UniProtKB/Swiss-Prot annotation:
Keywords: Acetylation. One of its GO terms (cellular component) is endoplasmic reticulum membrane. Belongs to the VAMP-associated protein (VAP) (TC 9.B.17) family. This is Vesicle-associated protein 3-1. The keyword Metal-binding does not apply. The modification N-acetylmethionine is found at M1. The keyword Ribonucleoprotein does not apply. It comes from Arabidopsis thaliana. May play a role in vesicle trafficking. Gene3D superfamilies: Immunoglobulins. InterPro entries: Ig-like_fold, MSP_dom, PapD-like_sf, VAP. Pfam families: Motile_Sperm. The modification N-acetylserine is found at S2. The lineage of its organism: Eukaryota, Viridiplantae, Streptophyta, Embryophyta, Tracheophyta. Residues 6-126 form the MSP domain.
Length: 149
């Protein structure tokens, strides 16, 4: 659970089952904790690797929005099954009467004087149930594993 005043974010990390040459998805739930409309925007450090739907929008008071994050098919296993990619959820109070189509980039601009809450989420990979763990491992900080999909 997040410490934001506007949104409760679940989960606080994005966990993708990993299989080579397959798109994988996970869900993110954004809950508006306020009595006002809240606009949100999802950003990532690697836009080419992920598809986020919706990547921005408006959440009505005390409502929840499901965001689907899809990782594009990977051609090789990441080193040590580690990801250094991150996501950031930005949220702001929206004026009454604003619709989802009226959510703009400027609403998330701190330079324009808007109060923007930001929450960073890490990406983790887990071996899928079809993944085999072998005895010729890669090691890192005492963990030994290698996944083949």
């Amino acid at each position: 659970m997040s410490n934001n005043e506007l949104l409760e974010i679940e989960p606080m990390y994005l966990q993708f089952p990993f299989e080579l040459k397959k798109q994988m998805s996970c869900s993110l739930y954004l809950t508006n904790k306020t009595d006002n409309n809240v606009a949100f925007k999802v950003k990532t450090t690697n836009r080419n690797n992920y598809c986020v739907r919706p990547n921005y929008g408006l959440i009505l008071p005390k409502s929840t929005c499901k965001v689907l994050v899809t990782m594009q098919a990977q051609k090789e296993v990441p080193s040590d099954m580690q990801s250094f990619e991150k996501f950031m959820i930005q949220s702001v109070l929206a004026s009454p009467g604003v619709t989802a189509k009226e959510v703009t980039r400027e609403m998330f601009s701190k330079e324009s004087g808007h109060v923007v809450e930001e929450t960073k989420l890490r990406v983790t990979y887990v071996c899928s149930t079809t993944t085999n763990i072998t005895s010729s491992p890669r090691t890192r900080r005492g963990f030994i594993f290698q996944c083949f999909c």
